[in-house]
Design a protein with these regions (language model features):
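Intrinsic disorder/low-complexity segments
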Residues: 1-31
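PLP-dependent amino-acid enzyme catalytic core
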Residues: 31-158
């Protein structure tokens, strides 16, 4: 399978031995190695739930390798996004956290930032599209964030 070969080659390459940033519109992609992942896992351990893995027979057959799925739906916010939100907030300085955070999302990322900010005592403003389902808006507010609705997601970047 070509994709699997490409992924394996990438992870064996020397490129990932050091962190570097790649500029992409509206985001930065960070390259990291397994030690960075272990450090992040330890950092967020007190704040996230350890979810279980389950072997997937159908997925394993489909892609040709032993595959397990991780049940991140059991995180407090119902998704894996809390891991990244906690990790980011925990790597910010006290001065940076004191300024608060702003996120743009109409879904799981919004709730993850709102929840992790609330737990860590950081003010959060979440910009959400005006057509975001009310259940997501309510959940995000329920975690303590200030929600500002935008006519479209692009307006949040202006």
């Amino acid at each position: 399978m070509r994709i699997r070969a490409d992924v394996n080659a990438y992870f064996r390459s020397a490129k990932i031995r050091s962190i570097r940033f790649i500029r992409v519109p509206f985001c930065y992609i960070t390259q990291m190695d397994i030690n960075d992942i272990k450090i992040a896992a330890e950092r967020i351990r007190p704040y996230v739930r350890r979810t279980h893995l389950e072997y997937s027979n159908s997925l394993s057959k489909r892609i040709g390798v032993h595959t397990s799925v991780k049940f991140e739906l059991f995180q407090k916010t119902g998704a894996f996004k809390a891991r990244g939100a906690f990790n980011k907030l925990l790597t910010m300085s006290d001065a940076e956290r004191a300024k608060g955070v702003v996120a743009v999302s109409g879904g799981n990322h919004a709730q993850a930032v709102a929840y992790s900010s609330s737990v860590l005592g950081v003010d959060a403003v979440i910009l959400m599209p005006a057509n975001t389902p009310q259940v997501y808006v309510d959940a995000t507010r329920g975690y303590g964030a200030t929600v500002e609705l935008q006519e479209n997601i692009g307006a949040a970047f202006v």
